[in-house]
Amino acid sequence: MYSAVTQDIQITVLPEFIPERSNADQAMFFWAYTVEIANQSEKTVQLTARHWKITDGNGRLEEVQGPGVVGEQPILKPGETFRYTSGSNLTTPSGIMTGAYRMVDENGEEFDAQIPVFSLDSPFVRRVLN
């Protein structure tokens, strides 16, 4: 589990390799990840946009931006959480993801809540010890 806090917004990510949707012979590797966004502040906030940075095992970077998450722009009152599950596929057996959610508080102030860097690992990763 990976976690980061920005302005009292805690983002926790739990990635999971999905072998049923992966095929090493065809260089297709799929992960699901569950994200929990917890509003630990004293203000109501809304998630308005996402910006993901996905890097595969060869260092190739893909950026994904758009409104909200899974078709929603959730509003979180103080103490509330929002959880969703999504997925990502790579052509390499490992990679990393990170990014930020654009948040706006009840006063109209915008800020980026950091998504922690998290590792996408599969059983097909070849470990090398130096």
Curated annotation (Swiss-Prot):
Organism of origin: Methylocella silvestris (strain DSM 15510 / CIP 108128 / LMG 27833 / NCIMB 13906 / BL2)
Pfam family, one: DUF525
Full protein name: Protein ApaG
InterPro entries: ApaG_domain, ApaG_sf, Uncharacterised_ApaG
ApaG domain ranges (all copies): 3-127
Highest taxon in the source lineage: Bacteria
Gene Ontology terms: biological process: error-free translesion synthesis
NCBIfam families, per database record: PRK05461.1 (NF003967)
Originating gene: apaG
